[in-house]
Amino acid sequence: MSRPLTDQEKRKQISVRGLAGVENVTELKKNFNRHLHFTLVKDRNVATPRDYYFALAYTVRDHLVGRWIRTQQHYYEKDPKRIYYLSLEFYIGRTLQNTMVNLALENACDEATYQLGLDMEELEEIEEDAGLGNGGLGRLAACFLDSMATLGLAAYGYGIRYEFGIFNQKISGGWQMEEADDWLRYGNPWEKARPEFTLPVHFYGRVEHTSQGAKWVDTQVVLAMPYDTPVPGYRNNVVNTMRLWSAKAPNDFNLKDFNVGGYIQAVLDRNLAENISRVLYPNDNFFEGKELRLKQEYFVVAATLQDIIRRFKSSKFGCLDPVRTNFDAFPDKVAIQLNDTHPSLAIPELMRILVDQERLEWEKAWEVTVKTCAYTNHTVLPEALERWPVHLIETLLPRHLQIIYEINQRFLNRVAAAFPGDVDRLRRMSLVEEGAVKRINMAHLCIAGSHAVNGVARIHSEILKKTIFKDFYELEPHKFQNKTNGITPRRWLVMCNPGLAEIIAERIGEEYIADLDQLRKLLSYVDDESFIRDVAKVKQENKLKFSAYLEKEYKVHINPNSLFDIQVKRIHEYKRQLLNCLHVITLYNRIKKEPNKFFVPRTVMIGGKAAPGYHMAKMIIKLITAIGDVVNHDPVVGDRLRVIFLENYRVSLAEKVIPAADLSEQISTAGTEASGTGNMKFMLNGALTIGTMDGANVEMAEEAGEENFFIFGMRVEDVERLDQKGYNAQEYYDRIPELRHVIDQLSSGFFSPKQPDLFKDIVNMLMHHDRFKVFADYEEYIKCQERVSALYKNPREWTRMVIRNIATSGKFSSDRTIAQYAREIWGVEPTRQRMPAPDEKI
């Protein structure tokens, strides 16, 4: 017999997480048992916690498969326009809890595991993150898949099944160390290998010109084997597919030409082909022109396009003969969205298939390609833009280079016709960049070959039209759009912050989960004492829970009553973790100067990974840990200030830290962060934002009201003016005593007594070549932080401001973003209609 439930536990069954019916719980226990014994071949005497996790995962997966098969059958019969989201990154995180939430199984599973003497939360912690992304771009793709399924779109995510995802970060002596992320070591219960759909991908070789046109011959072949992962919509019985390709060597690999005794070597060399899907490149907002990376980009594109065309051609009447030989209808049945330029080779590859294999005239093929493809830009940083050396493409993809040259020739003819005599414009707009090394500008290729080009926040889309893509905007203004990013409220509220989701549902019902604009109804509760109390209580519980987690995992003590000041994102100069550091040191100096004065206690937490080859980013991590070593051990400071570096920041850690945050740091130099999505997660979870007018911060402040936002610093126009005038760090150093003191401490080795010049590179950069103008925003940032502390002293007013932020965060649902892509780019209509469940008649 299980113990009787307390009233509070009984009430928890009235929940956004769905009811636990008795039959359901019994059934789940039965299936759990079956999987433990028959799938995992274990009994309770030898089963490990991981076995129990797998048994639960397979049990939950059973509830997906009927819906998955039914959804795919439905698409086959109805033949809707299909959306293909191509991305080199999908930063999924964990799948178990998200699946339970979307299928309304969470309560029943909780009860079933409890009755079996297991703790579901402990089992959830065993799952490895699927870390197939670096940061925002990959996580956006994952949120988009969730929204596309929730909105009933016939959508597919296509990418690479990296054997090793983003590295695990270990901090040793204050320095970042990288460890391989062997996430598949124990197997992945959520994927289904589909070897029967394996496809060939060609590399190298040469082009033969025949009477029938160009032929790409003498190529090396690598096989692409697909692994499918189900993507469930929110309680609508839709389950879409994410298909990730894995590289396999063909069976005759290197055996055609092996010499006597070369058989063993030929088999060992299969690894070379299979290296294509071995590891994710760990660069965020930085282009590294490596051949293996170019192979990855073509690999995903070539396999995916074959799959798309196979699906387009196959009829819905079950006959194997291709029925559609005419490609006129292709853009009516297929939309391809390019997530940044990484899959840009889809454009020449589709042209190659249409012209060389399907024998379409160039003009017709080009019309089909442009109508099918659309391109999302994610950055304006010049070092992040992909510019592939011509000699690399020529070696690896000789036919594609010819096609790119032809595209360029015809494109420049159009430009010349539109702007006669403007030779410099031709040079600027060419897909081919002349120079010491000839390069292909992949963004230019994407704009020329797409019918829509979008930025990811209003300010970013404007910057594209006014600066890096100005010439293209003048030629084809109709192509340019904005689609402000969003986040899925299923993972980023219901799943990671059930306490908050619950008290919201008690006031306005549960419909907001799939219609986030309904959060506006909370504006009428901004003076409701019981709601104010509930919001503050949930936040305090989340802070206590996160404090306990830090203590358990990292043996760090923090004061849960302090202001939790959090900056978690990739470590990059443009994101200005250094500005945060300068504030922390300034606070420290103020406490030391007036030790008896009252200071609002703060725990500053900074987390994020640095690209392994990015020296400055690694120095920034070392600086944060060095500041922590001084501040956290100074008895004068006590628990008024703590500095914590959050090791190995990833999706599953974000889900823990974001609900506990009081203050969200979004402090990039205006004009550098395309959108940001972490900012939205904090807003939805009841943190206030301190930030510059950059990316989506601008629209968040507009929605919430600037008076409910801590805005500081230069605007884009100010940055431009300062660039024209010339940014001189020295003048800020000379003028601002507190800043000067901080920099002198860094220079003198105050934070690195054993190596006094440890931070000389950082000081030198800040003083002499700081592209991101940290000093220019220092004064306003410090003043703004004083306003933050002052408000935090008044908990009621703080919480009222939090409620206003939560209530106005509805715009930042990825459901809104995807509905706009659907209507304005893909030409399909989203729907919240349910599919019939597997046990219902259609």
Curated annotation (Swiss-Prot):
**Is the keyword Cell inner membrane assigned to this protein?**
no
For this UniProt record, give its keywords in alphabetical order, as a comma-separated list.
Acetylation, Allosteric enzyme, Carbohydrate metabolism, Disease variant, Glycogen metabolism, Glycogen storage disease, Glycosyltransferase, Nucleotide-binding, Phosphoprotein, Pyridoxal phosphate, Transferase
Q: Which residues carry this modification: Phosphotyrosine?
A: Y204, Y227, Y473
Record note on modification? Phosphorylation of Ser-15 converts phosphorylase B (unphosphorylated) to phosphorylase A.
- Gene source species: Bos taurus
Describe its function: Allosteric enzyme that catalyzes the rate-limiting step in glycogen catabolism, the phosphorolytic cleavage of glycogen to produce glucose-1-phosphate, and plays a central role in maintaining cellular and organismal glucose homeostasis.
What are the Phosphoserine sites (modified residues) in this protein?
Answer: S15, S430, S747, S748
The disorder on record is: Defects in PYGM are the cause of glycogen storage disease V (GSD-V); also known as McArdle disease.
Feature type site, description Involved in the association of subunits: C109, C143
Name of the protein: Glycogen phosphorylase, muscle form
Q: For site (May be involved in allosteric control), what residue positions does UniProt give?
A: Y156
Residues that the record marks as modified (N-acetylserine) are S2
Q: Which PANTHER family would you find in this protein's record?
A: GLYCOGEN PHOSPHORYLASE, GLYCOGEN PHOSPHORYLASE, MUSCLE FORM
One annotated GO biological process: glycogen catabolic process
Q: State the needed cofactors, names only.
A: pyridoxal 5'-phosphate
